[in-house]
Amino acid sequence: TEKYESVKESMDSYLETWKRWNMEFIEAFHLIESSLYESSEERRISLLEKSLSVILDETYEKMLHYAQNLKSPITMLHMLGIIMPILGLVILPLVVSFMCQVKWFHLAALYNIALPIIVYYLGKNILSSRPTGYGDTDISEENPELKKYRNMIIPVGNFEIKINPMIISAMVMIVLLIIGFSPMLIHMMDTTGNWDIVVDKDDSKGIHISSVMDDPDAKYSLLGYRKSQGCPPGEDGAVGVGDIVGPFGLGAALLSLMIIAGIGVGLGIYFRLKSSNIIKIRDKAKELEKEFAASLFQLGNRLGDGLPAEIAFAKVAEVMENNVTGDFFRTVSNNITRMGMSVEQAIFDKKYGAMVYYPSTLIESSMKVLIESSKKGPLIAAKAVISVSRYIKEIHRVDERLKDLMSDTISSMKSQIKFLTPAIAGIVIGITSMITGILGQLGTQLRVLTEGQGQEGLGAAAPMISMFGEGIPTFYFQLIVGLYVVQLIYILTVITNGIENGSDSLGEKYSLGANLINSTVTYIIVSMIIMLIFNIISGSIMSQLKLGGV
């Protein structure tokens, strides 16, 4: 572009942009520049090795401090995002029951808007302080040939049917959402407004269809709609008297779990199908990266013996037989011998090159070094390849040390995502369902008692009636908590992946797919079991409790 007078001036200007983010990169680059002006070969190699150790050691030191400083923010995130909100969920149903001005949408604004924003902000602050380093990339973004693997591929003979993951995800989501919202749909289609399926307190009647709204003889109900007593409850002129509210039924609460399944599992399926094929290809390349240092060392030795690169690849392929590295070198060798390609074409050809099957920036960079250095002769290429081999080993060593530093934090966050958060939230939903059911049945029995005896006949018990508002239906409460669990799983997965792998969009999508499906299913199973157990216990107690003979 002729903006700068020399390459050095252009490079210095470029390095200025890194000053704020990565000083060790600038220092290492200056050492490489200095090596170009050294007359002594020994001194030149020493400077190059120094540049490598500077960037690796400084990165490790930064990550060490990051890991040490991570404990406090993660604890704060855990308390503000998980412990305190879930403890609050135990109290909030009681607040709603005794403060009729508080509605379910107030809780939704707190749990599904305010808290996720706070947790996301805290998480982004944690990630923003992470030192830059080696990170994985989405290989489908760099290689257009791999974009087809973002779809679900079904082989049919010689053809492949590609299905967009969004279609499958949308189908699953729509079916589960219809099932989840069925209590509201049934109520909307019911012209009388009184239809319900109930389990009677009298065991001899069992399950039957009821035409009485808020049937006092029902132990459990499917819908459980009732007429509002207004706010404040039981007082003349109260707001909302006679409005139909609900659904309060156990059946509706259980069916509402399908809404969360639709959102959580639907999103999980989308992320899983979009990334699973590509992650398999990348994992294969990662396996090659693990063995690549040893194979490069062997390749360097063959080149050092004076063998041309074409023959050296075949020799290494024979030695590294029956593993991924051997397959890579064999692919290169076959392209050279059978297709008459040059070494560069055999590796980088867009259609048949070895890099098509093993997409990796690390391997690609190593092979480019080999190609450029081999132009200056086998001995120069041998030294270059052996140096790259040592560099890869050093990167692997530092990477393993970093994983060891972060292991406690990462394992703690993964356990929260996979089990603790959905399980605790599921238990809270079960307890809430029981509390709401007991308060609702007590309110119903007191109202029936009032209608039979009047306010005067109740005496001192009369003020108790106004204590019991409608409360919040478990149907809505479960939606709020379930959606919060899905949001929390999403945010924590993004944070965990960012801490562990840095900027890795492909790994993030794959982790989101696995965690959203597994954690949502865990939440649904725990919620369903606890809800049934606690409601069976409370139903048995309330069926034996008769206020004033009611």
Q: Model-found features: residue ranges?
A:
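Intracellular, membrane-proximal regulatory regions of polytopic membrane proteins
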Residues: 1-39, 300-376
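Hydrophobic alpha-helical signal-anchor/transmembrane segments
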Residues: 19-30, 34-305, 318-327, 354-359, ...
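Short, well-structured alpha-helical interface segments that form or flank functional binding sites
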Residues: 290, 294, 361, 365, ...
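Long, well-ordered mid-to-C-terminal structural blocks that present hydrophobic/aromatic surfaces
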Residues: 379-395
